[in-house]
Swiss-Prot record:
It comes from the Bacteria. The chain crosses the membrane at residues 35-55, 93-113, 124-144, 178-198, 213-233, 234-254. It comes from Koribacter versatilis (strain Ellin345). Keywords: Cell inner membrane, Cell membrane, Membrane, Protein transport, Translocation, Transmembrane, Transmembrane helix, Transport. It holds the Pfam family TatC. Forms a complex with TatA. This is Sec-independent protein translocase protein TatC. InterPro entries: Sec-indep_translocase_CS, TatC. GO terms for cellular component: TAT protein transport complex. It is found in: Cell inner membrane. Coiled coil: none annotated. Belongs to the TatC family. GO terms for biological process: intracellular protein transmembrane transport; protein transport by the Tat complex.
């Protein structure tokens, strides 16, 4: 005999009632369970990346090797401390493990918060998680293939009268600063999404202040660009300007005033 189908609205209401019926200790127990699974996934991600740490390092050092080869220099990094290579591998495997584990960690976050959300709120969560990961990866890919190689080639070529002695720790820190920094910069639409959802900013306000925003973007690009040339600064600034324009569209879609107008128009059309 087939099991009866439960109406989604009833299921959501039952889930809300079950959540409200949970005691404080039960909430803590649920949180503890999700935290444990989060650490399990991070440890598993670290283990996988440690197993492949040499391949990951080869991928990470490719930009500097190309820059050194382009300037006819010895393609080898150095270290000044016996523990430096091992510590570098640990740091690299841990950060790469966080990337690998991030979808599973976000899923644990979803399992913890989902019972406390209404249906209209849940529809934002999964697109938010997907967009966050996608934008961060987009920033990292842009930095790895576009910004970082050009910056390294310029910097090493600019100081051709000196012999570089680049340590693996210094290179790793610079690599992570550029890649992670651009990944965070690419999260601009997510930040605007929440600000617009709370009514703090609007699409109209962002559009009216476009010229000032572009000026601020170029100032930020000048600060975070590792070189002093205008070309690399423009390479940094161009995607941020595009992300700002995309954020205007996001603000228009989610601002409470615009959502209320669309709902009223839909009700008037249906009526």
């Amino acid at each position: 005999m087939p099991s009866p189908t439960i109406d989604p609205a009833i299921r959501a209401r039952l889930s809300q009632e079950a959540l409200k019926g949970m005691s404080f200790l039960e909430h803590l127990e649920e949180l503890r369970r999700r935290i444990i699974w989060t650490f399990v996934y991070i440890a598993a991600g670290f283990g996988v990346c440690w197993w492949w740490h040499e391949q990951i390092y080869d991928f990470m050092q490719r930009p500097i090797m190309k820059a050194l080869a382009a300037n006819h220099l010895d393609q080898k990094l150095v270290y000044l401390n016996p523990t430096e290579p091992f510590n570098m591998y640990l740091k690299m495997a841990f950060i790469a493990g966080l990337f690998v584990a991030s979808p599973f960690v976000l899923y644990q976050v979803w399992l913890f918060i989902a019972p406390g959300l209404y249906k209209r709120e849940r529809r934002y969560v999964l697109p938010f998680m997907f967009s966050t990961v996608l934008l961060f990866l987009g920033g990292g890919v842009f930095g790895y293939y576009m910004v970082y190689p050009n910056a390294l080639t310029f910097l090493i070529g600019y100081s051709h009268q000196f012999s570089p002695m680049i340590t693996i720790s210094e290179y790793t820190d610079l690599f992570l600063t550029i890649i992670l920094g651009l990944g965070i910069v690419f999260e601009m639409p997510i930040l605007v999404f929440f600000l617009a959802l709370m009514g703090i900013v609007s699409a109209g306000w962002m559009w009216r202040n476009l010229r000032y925003s572009i000026l601020v973007i170029f100032v930020i690009a000048a600060i975070i660009t590792p070189t002093t040339d205008i070309m690399n600064m423009c390479v940094f600034a161009a995607p941020m300007i595009l992300l700002y324009i995309l954020s205007i569209g996001v603000a228009f879609l989610v601002h409470p005033k615009n959502r209320r107008k669309r709902r009223e128009a839909q009700e008037a059309q249906e009526g």
